[in-house]
């Protein structure tokens, strides 16, 4: 699978650079 950014995106947005939301977890692009 994709590398996990260690961030959740419960609010629908990832703040870690180059990460995207695949609710509820942020993944690196």
Swiss-Prot record:
Post-translational modification: This is a cyclic peptide.
UniProt keyword terms in alphabetical order: Disulfide bond, Plant defense
Domain of life assignment: Eukaryota
GO BP terms, alphabetized: defense response
Annotated disulfide bonds: 5-19, 9-21, 14-26
Keyword Plastid assigned: no
Keyword Nuclease set for record: no
Family: Belongs to the cyclotide family.
Domain remarks in the Swiss-Prot or TrEMBL record: The presence of a 'disulfide through disulfide knot' structurally defines this protein as a knottin.
Main function: Probably participates in a plant defense mechanism.
Identification of the protein by name: Cyclotide mobo-B
Organism: Melicytus obovatus
Upper taxonomic lineage: Eukaryota, Viridiplantae, Streptophyta, Embryophyta, Tracheophyta
